[in-house]
């Protein structure tokens, strides 16, 4: 009886892992499609362009 419970739990874990990985694959394709056609790549800027320096330069 214990072995059947163990097998059931392992099958449930494997099914959850497979469902999660297939969802990630679907989202990867969608992101790639949207980035190429609709969005331009914009690098991250730490500070705005008109941000004053923290201390005056000598």
Curated annotation (Swiss-Prot):
- Compartment annotation: Secreted
GO CC aspect terms: extracellular region
Q: List the disulfide bonds.
A: none
Keywords for the protein's UniProt record, in alphabetical order: Secreted, Signal
- Please tell me in which tissues this protein is expressed: Expressed in mammary glands.
Q: What is this protein called?
A: Histatherin
Q: Which InterPro entries match?
A: Histatin/statherin
Q: Which domain of life is it from?
A: Eukaryota
Q: Name the GO terms of the biological process aspect.
A: defense response to bacterium
Q: Which organism is it from?
A: Bos taurus (Bovine)
Any signal peptide, and if so, which residues?
1-19
Gene name in the database record: HSTN
Major subcellular location class: secreted
Q: Which family does it belong to?
A: Belongs to the histatin/statherin family.
């Amino acid at each position: 009886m214990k072995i059947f419970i163990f097998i059931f739990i392992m099958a449930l874990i494997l099914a959850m892992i497979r469902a999660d990985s297939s969802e990630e694959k679907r989202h990867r394709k969608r992101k790639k499609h949207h980035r190429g056609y609709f969005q331009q790549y914009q690098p991250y800027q730490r500070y705005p362009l008109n941000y004053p320096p923290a201390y005056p330069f000598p």
